[in-house]
Amino acid sequence: MKRNRKPKWLRAKLPSGPGYRQVQSIVDDNQLHTVCESARCPNLGECWSRGTATLMILGEVCTRTCSFCAVQSGKPPELDLGEPARVAEAVAKMNLKHCVLTSVARDDLKDGGAKVWANVIRSVRHRNPGVAIEVLTPDFQGDLASLDLVLDANPDIFNHNLETVERLQQPIRKSATYERTLSVLSHAKSRGFTTKSGIMLGIGEEEDEIGQAIRDLAKVGVNILTIGQYLQPTPSHAPIDRWAPPEEFEAWKEFALSIGIEVVESGPLVRSSYHAEEQSERFGVEEAASA
């Protein structure tokens, strides 16, 4: 389906209710950022109303300028040394069983922010024994030593998004590469982690390219895959090529499952952390974290 008015299947729930207001208050009181807000996630209303949010660490200014992403780009401020404790406190106040953490890319830092990542994971775990921690990290410019700092903090699920097909990596993810993303996922898998990745539809990809991307993710052992519709944040971002219909998302889900990816969340409004807790239950993550 070529681009025209946004179809009815992309209508999202508007933010409202006591759960939404509580999350907003906790985030504001702890001077934190969420990718829900920064990336203009269409599911913010639904997730916040359920009392969940994806907390974004290392500030809200990214050193990269990906043409699909709404997160602000520029020169980040100095590191906030109090951030790990405040994130841990926010997780406690939200009473989360499954915590999703992400960050901007910090290519200005030698380790890409890996030490901060490790400190946040450990602080959340110390303050919230039994919480399952899912991380959605940048690629640390392919530096496996930095990646290992994060993995050594022992998150329960490691997520790193492929985002799009190989041909579109350079125009869409200027500072990332297809092979580097697969290498990061492969390294996490080699260390025994449950791994997760995601791709978007509607940004200019072809059908055979989607299939190849899913096969490549399966080859590096990805356990969980998310597939969602690309939504253009502003007119200056990459244009929407088409609106993929719900039945296409269902078809790609069936394909991914058929080649060995164990859990697939696929639909127009699906984003990386959408229904993350439910996905992780397939792997007994919550039970293992609370043991």
Task: Name each model-derived stretch.
Residues 67, 170, 208:
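Alpha-helical elements of the RecA-like P-loop NTPase motor core of helicases
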Residues 60, 138-141, 204, 269:
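Short, surface-exposed acidic/glycine-rich loop or hinge patches that mediate macromolecular interfaces
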Residues 65, 109, 168, 235, ...:
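Glycine/Thr-rich phosphate-binding loops of Rossmann-like dinucleotide-binding domains
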